[in-house]
Every structure is written in structure tokens, then in C-alpha cells.
Swiss-Prot record:
<dbReference type="GO" id="GO:0006509">
    <property type="term" value="P:membrane protein ectodomain proteolysis"/>
</dbReference>
<comment type="subunit">
    <text>The functional gamma-secretase complex is composed of at least four polypeptides: a presenilin homodimer (PSEN1 or PSEN2), nicastrin (NCSTN), APH1 (APH1A or APH1B) and PSENEN/PEN2.</text>
</comment>
<dbReference type="GO" id="GO:0005794">
    <property type="term" value="C:Golgi apparatus"/>
</dbReference>
<dbReference type="GO" id="GO:0042987">
    <property type="term" value="P:amyloid precursor protein catabolic process"/>
</dbReference>
<dbReference type="GO" id="GO:0042982">
    <property type="term" value="P:amyloid precursor protein metabolic process"/>
</dbReference>
<keyword id="KW-0914">Notch signaling pathway</keyword>
<feature type="topological domain" description="Lumenal">
    <location>
        <begin position="208"/>
        <end position="213"/>
    </location>
</feature>
<comment type="function">
    <text>Non-catalytic subunit of the gamma-secretase complex, an endoprotease complex that catalyzes the intramembrane cleavage of integral membrane proteins such as Notch receptors and APP (amyloid-beta precursor protein). Required for normal gamma-secretase assembly. The gamma-secretase complex plays a role in Notch and Wnt signaling cascades and regulation of downstream processes via its role in processing key regulatory proteins, and by regulating cytosolic CTNNB1 levels.</text>
</comment>
<dbReference type="GO" id="GO:0016485">
    <property type="term" value="P:protein processing"/>
</dbReference>
<keyword id="KW-0256">Endoplasmic reticulum</keyword>
<feature type="topological domain" description="Cytoplasmic">
    <location>
        <begin position="90"/>
        <end position="118"/>
    </location>
</feature>
<feature type="topological domain" description="Lumenal">
    <location>
        <begin position="1"/>
        <end position="2"/>
    </location>
</feature>
<dbReference type="GO" id="GO:0010008">
    <property type="term" value="C:endosome membrane"/>
</dbReference>
<keyword id="KW-0333">Golgi apparatus</keyword>
<dbReference type="GO" id="GO:0005886">
    <property type="term" value="C:plasma membrane"/>
</dbReference>
<dbReference type="GO" id="GO:0005789">
    <property type="term" value="C:endoplasmic reticulum membrane"/>
</dbReference>
<feature type="topological domain" description="Cytoplasmic">
    <location>
        <begin position="235"/>
        <end position="265"/>
    </location>
</feature>
Amino acid sequence: MGAAVFFGCTFVAFGPAFALFLITVAGDPLRVIILVAGAFFWLVSLLLASVVWFILVHVTDRSDARLQYGLLIFGAAVSVLLQEVFRFAYYKLLKKADEGLASLSEDGRSPISIRQMAYVSGLSFGIISGVFSVINILADALGPGVVGIHGDSPYYFLTSAFLTAAIILLHTFWGVVFFDACERRRYWALGLVVGSHLLTSGLTFLNPWYEASLLPIYAVTVSMGLWAFITAGGSLRSIQRSLLCRRQEDSRVMVYSALRIPPED
């Protein structure tokens, strides 16, 4: 049962991200480099947040449970703010790299657009964030006959997996909206990205009341997904065009196959 829970939760948590990586990133070496570099930036932000939280815990009264819980909330907020600061720093770095690539190309154009960089960097932040948030839970899931931890809900592992999937997608959407806001200098959009990130992080403290945390987080995920879709230039008309193109391609394949001469026996 432990192995089934482990693999099931792993596929739920990282299935969408793995599919996005294979379809949109793995085939382009430049995107893979941006993905790895983005993960490094997120790790540095986590390291700094951990140092801040570690210092605060050791300079305060560790026997005061309420104080320590408050420090945990404060540490989560600091971590969110540092992640967004490093997202901005990564945007600046990619902007410089984009200008350098454009100057080196023959036609004066960069081989990758800012929107593509935003998507890949957001995906990198999401994947590494998901790995660090759920890896210990998945390790505990491998235990023999594990259903819950210390009498917690039997849905603990499954809800954690769905929460991780939402966080990964949110980071992807945040990256797209954040980079676009930086390009157009829309400071209100930057504020909404940071605010939604803080809200999502705060909602996780409502666990194990999963109805009060998971449902609002997925509502935020859907909202940010629609915003990122529109920001990237998507619309209902573009969806219709993509569907029509697929239908036309399918019809062409059918016509071609129908016109082929059957092989002689």
C-alpha cells in the first residue's frame, strides 16, 4: 500500500509539470538552461529565508509555542517575499541575456521571447518548490501500510499532492504575469502577484481543514491561469482557431489516406 500511495501521489503532484516539461521545454536546450538556472534562483531564496527563520528561532524563547507559531508564519511570509525578489532578479538577468542573444544573432532577434522565458522560469520555480514541499511527505508515504501520520486524516497524502500540483501551476502562472507586469511597468499587477502568493501561503496554515485551504487555493489557481492565458495573448478566438486547424489537419490526413492506392496482393 505504501508504494501505491507513493506513486499515486507522485503522479498527481508532478504529472502536469512533467507533461509541460516534456512537451514545451525538453526539446529546446536553451529552455532547459533557463529552467535549471531558475531552480537555482529559487533555492537561493529558500536558503536566505531558512537563515532568517533559523536565527529568529534561536534568539527567541523556544518554549513559547504561540511565539514559535507566529515566527513560522513570519518565516513563510519572508520566504514568499524573497521568492518574488529573486523572481525579479531573474527577470533582470534574462532581460540582459535576451539583449545579448539578439545582438549575436544574424537577424537581430533573440531565439527565445520574453514570454517564453517567463513561462519556463515560472515552471522552474514551481517544480523546485513542489519538490521541496512534498518530498518528505512522499518519503513517509513509503512506510508499510501508512494511511495518515500520527492519526491525521487518511487523505493527508492525497491532499498534499493536489496542493503541490496547484503550487507548481501557480508559480508558472505567476511567472508569466510577473514578467509581463515588469515589461509594461504595471505595478498593480506585481502587487496582485505578490498578494496572491502571500494568500496562497497563508491558506496552507488552515490545514488539516482541507476544505478551507485546498478549495480557495484552486480557485486562485484557476483565476491566475485565466489571467496568465490572457496575458500571453490567448483568447476564445485563438482557441477556436487552434481547434479548427487541428480539424483541418485531420481532414487532410483522411483525404490523403483515402486517395492512396491500395497495395496490390
